[in-house]
Amino acid sequence: MAASAVCRAAGAGTRVLLRTRRSPALLRSSDLRGTATYAQALQSVPETQVSQLDNGLRVASEQSSQPTCTVGVWIDAGSRYESEKNNGAGYFVEHLAFKGTKNRPGNALEKEVESMGAHLNAYSTREHTAYYIKALSKDLPKAVELLADIVQNCSLEDSQIEKERDVILQELQENDTSMRDVVFNYLHATAFQGTPLAQSVEGPSENVRKLSRADLTEYLSRHYKAPRMVLAAAGGLEHRQLLDLAQKHFSGLSGTYDEDAVPTLSPCRFTGSQICHREDGLPLAHVAIAVEGPGWAHPDNVALQVANAIIGHYDCTYGGGAHLSSPLASIAATNKLCQSFQTFNICYADTGLLGAHFVCDHMSIDDMMFVLQGQWMRLCTSATESEVLRGKNLLRNALVSHLDGTTPVCEDIGRSLLTYGRRIPLAEWESRIAEVDARVVREVCSKYFYDQCPAVAGFGPIEQLPDYNRIRSGMFWLRF
């Protein structure tokens, strides 16, 4: 009885479906039409509003209907601006920012953030430092006040400095267990040897032990200036409100320098070279290979990002095998050449690192390197329209999905104003991506990959890592 009832229901449903398919009224119904197109969606993204205070501080925001907001300060300060003597000072200062200010000593700062139900975070890179708070939109005034206090009134008490010194030394030991972090520090050290970009963000342990209160004070007074900062916010807020709060809490921030004290970026030359740290007791080898890439604002970056999307990424835990769309991933999975690989395009103000990092068994290093370089050469000589279209769609997806939430949007605003001088709209990114075709990919890849000297870093059981001259010979093909 139940089965026959189901059959009758299914039959009735089919007749209704057939009738509705033939109904012109239903086809004309606005409720069933497609939603906004991709291009229309890009045009509807809220505008980023930018203002500037008299002292040079830039204030930027993107308003949305969300009940939360993220607000932060992005600063042109990082290990690239440090010398060998004070390398690690910026990272040290960032740590001290969480340990109280002159107005909120001890754990008073943490308690105030927690009482709001907010999250305070910070990070440092080779060129930038950021402090940001994610909170309810109604708590924006308090969040801006806290950020201003952190940036302008960092407590540099001797007792707190000594406590944090031990914490950072412990962190350095923990960082040495992250093979990926180690190999990328090695890659920077060999690629930019003898220049500030070779320095790690955390600095060497010798510097951590020696940095004094005077060193940290000098670093703050030199780099934490209004023209080097961006106050960025995203979420449920109004730009006028943010600008008024910035005027109230940041107008006293210094915006002038002595003539000889303006921080400048010295040129960082790229050196094709190799650094190897053999450790046979480790289970897997980590290898990174990169050529010199362009800086943030270079127009070639879009085509290179498409090329990286074509090469793709792979992790053996994801599955997929031979059916993966990336030729390199398919070969790696079918022949079990590696545990994982990923491409990267690390940009700095005037240079960058463009390459790939892979993790594999010690007996597969040679084969994985050979296949990877072969894919680069193939893009230089015979990239096809179909795979370029796939790479463009992957890049579009990554570009849009990355900006999901107030924190990623806020970070994008702050970083963009420091690197580009403006926030590039998604519609403009789309037009740049649309201009890329197979010819452009071949030309740009030939410019950066073909017959170029790479930098190579290896860590772990790397006995089978090819000699540098052999790796260099893999950067061109003797084919006609």
UniProtKB/Swiss-Prot annotation:
The modification N6-succinyllysine is found at K163. The modification N6-acetyllysine is found at K111, K138, K163, K248. GO terms for cellular component: mitochondrial inner membrane; mitochondrion. SUPFAM superfamilies: LuxS/MPP-like metallohydrolase. The modification Phosphoserine is found at S212. It comes from the Eukaryota. This is Cytochrome b-c1 complex subunit 1, mitochondrial. The gene is UQCRC1.
